[in-house]
Amino acid sequence: MDLTFPKHLYYEPEHHVWCLVESDQKIRLGIDPLGISSLGELAYLSLNPLESKVRKGQAMGVLEAAKMTGELIAPLSGSIIKRNREALEDPYQVNQDPYGKGWLCVIECEDWETESCLLYTSPSPR
């Protein structure tokens, strides 16, 4: 897998989630290649329902992969306004194209200005 990290994205390195600012407070989320590499091939992916509130650091979904099963942790607080149906139906897309067809959801962030300060513009750990 190609471990590239586009510079126009923000990263939450602890849980390997990338964030793309789409407009205003709308943020597209996905799993970064390092996270995918450590998970192995995804077999199952579930996200909280549309319009559900998520809190930074809390579960926004569940995933099952070759190397682990666990919760998908939200990097930001807000509401899920869009879910990637194709990735939910075929989680392998997340492995194959994490920045393209494998994105997870779009969150309407409650306070991007404050919460984005805790994200990185490269995946380097603290």
PLM feature spans:
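Interdomain regulatory linker/hinge segments that flank or connect interaction modules
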Residues: M1-H15
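A residue-level detector for short acidic-glycine micro-motifs
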Residues: W18-L20, K82, D111
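Short beta-strand-turn/beta-hairpin segments enriched in glycine/proline and small hydrophobics
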Residues: V21-E41, A65-K67, E71-A74
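Short histidine-centered loop motifs in beta-beta connectors
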Residues: S38-K53, I73, R83-N84
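A structural signal for short beta-strand/turn segments enriched in small hydrophobics and glycine
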Residues: E51-A66
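Structured functional modules or segments
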Residues: L63-D97
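Glycine- and charge-enriched low-complexity intrinsically disordered segments
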Residues: Y92-L119
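Conserved small/polar residues in nucleotide/adenosyl-binding loops
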Residues: Y120-R126
